[in-house]
Amino acid sequence: MSIRVAIAGARGKMGAEAVHTVMKHDKMELVAVLDYKEVGKTLADLDMFPASYTVPIFTEMHDLVEATSPDVLVDLTNPHSVYNHTKEALNLNVRPVIGTTGFTDAQLEELSTIAKEKELGCIIAPNFAIGAILMMKFAKEAAKYLPDVEIIEMHHDHKLDAPSGTAVKTAQLIQEARTQKTQGHPEEKETIEGARGGDFDGMRIHSVRLPGLVAHQQVLFGGDGQLLTIRHDSLNRNSFMSGIAFCVEEVMKMDQLVYGLENII
């Protein structure tokens, strides 16, 4: 029996790739798309999709769920919309798979409570690329031995949040593995504000936004006479699709919220 999938954010680059992925998947059926703009009745009305993509488009979550009964909502929208989408989906008994970042700790706690009460799976993944998940795991392990760390994340210039969810998640994992410490000279002074990057538990996070980039991150570990660099590059958005498909299948087996793909693989 196919998993019934709805997608929010289908007109974005990631969302469009996800549409093609679900349409081609033999264990999934794309039953609806959520789009706040009235862009057409079906995906076939949009120039970016083939005429055979007759999947209906809805502007309201409630109408979408009532008409198409999806099992899973894949959200690839933006930080302004994702919290409301996730909360509404859970309250309508739809399992969210979220690839959008920008949640506050309070929002994550509330969503986790709802998912637990309803015994529904929910996956919030700052990054769907398997290689990026391995990078985070390796970084956590390295921090046990090399606690002086800086993170440089680089993304396309249309990304709204900084630092990226992947960088924040990496820093949180490193925080679990090392004792908090202040890095750099104790009397260092920024002659340009922000030059040393954002401070997270003593480690510095630097965000780069440039055209031509997709999603890239390096974690630098310094030690006496040595530098260890762990780096991951997503060269195109296909790198995320296997992770999305994996999460759609996995969320059907779950009864609570999981934050981070590294907690599943």
UniProtKB/Swiss-Prot annotation:
**One Pfam family recorded for the sequence:** DapB_C
Under InterPro entries, the record lists: DapB_C (IPR022663), DapB_N (IPR000846), DapB_N_CS (IPR022664), DHDPR_bac (IPR023940), NAD(P)-bd_dom_sf (IPR036291)
Query: What is its subcellular localisation?
Result: Cytoplasm
- Spell out the catalytic residues: H155, K159
Q: Which amino acids does the record list as binding NADP(+)?
A: K37
Which CDD domains does this UniProt record tie to the protein? DHDPR_N (cd02274)
Q: Which UniProt keywords apply?
A: Amino-acid biosynthesis, Cytoplasm, Diaminopimelate biosynthesis, Lysine biosynthesis, NAD, NADP, Oxidoreductase
- Which positions are annotated as binding NAD(+)? G9, A10, R11, G12, K13, M14, G99, T100, T101, A125, P126, N127, F128
User: What would be an example GO MF term here?
Assistant: NAD binding
Documented EC number(s): 1.17.1.8
Q: Which reaction does it catalyse?
A: (S)-2,3,4,5-tetrahydrodipicolinate + NAD(+) + H2O = (2S,4S)-4-hydroxy-2,3,4,5-tetrahydrodipicolinate + NADH + H(+); (S)-2,3,4,5-tetrahydrodipicolinate + NADP(+) + H2O = (2S,4S)-4-hydroxy-2,3,4,5-tetrahydrodipicolinate + NADPH + H(+)
Q: Specify the pathway.
A: Amino-acid biosynthesis; L-lysine biosynthesis via DAP pathway; (S)-tetrahydrodipicolinate from L-aspartate: step 4/4
Protein residues bound to (S)-2,3,4,5-tetrahydrodipicolinate: H156, G165, T166
Leader sequence range is none
Q: Which GO terms describe its cellular component?
A: cytosol
Name the GO terms of the biological process aspect.
Answer: diaminopimelate biosynthetic process; lysine biosynthetic process via diaminopimelate
Summary of the function given for this chain in its UniProt record: Catalyzes the conversion of 4-hydroxy-tetrahydrodipicolinate (HTPA) to tetrahydrodipicolinate.
The entry sums up its family as follows: Belongs to the DapB family.
Q: Which HAMAP family has this protein been placed in?
A: DapB
Q: What is this protein called?
A: 4-hydroxy-tetrahydrodipicolinate reductase
Gene transcribed to yield this protein: dapB
